[in-house]
Amino acid sequence: ELFDWQSIPAVKALAGSPRITPPFKPHLEDKLWLALLWSPALKKIWEQTLRGSHLKRLRELVPFGWVLDPTPLPPHAALPKINVHSWDEVADFSQKERQLVLKISGFHETAWGSRGVFIGHDMPGPEWSERLHSALDLSSEQPWIVQEFREGRRIEHPVFRDDGSVEMMQG
């Protein structure tokens, strides 16, 4: 992991020393958790593991998501919230329906720095379809997720300076 290690002075100084695997904070680096939060099969586990107010807040902050899985759904089933029977239908969504984000997950050279992130409505339909089908084909080797798209926004937040002072900034 740490594909950008050369830009981190402390890690660069250790180059060739210890071998570190998995990454330093795997629980923060794997996007799969973003989709698993919404898995109906895990609902009770999340409710038992997390305080109610914390789970509620996480669900407010984390856009709804799905683990990309090529396994066919039973005839009577549908993907939650988008109510389609297959990823092929999602691949054929119109630009308006493609308010979705496709993301590679796990520990891969394209899983950081937005290298493996594709915004559905920002790309032509054929390219969206190709990316989605490619991710489905690769899903047995590398996990992928799809999330609802949400517009970013600027907020005011504290920045803690080395001298102990706190400055409010927009970001």
Feature map (PLM): residue ranges:
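Domain-scale recognition of functional cores that engage charged ligands
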Residues: 1-171
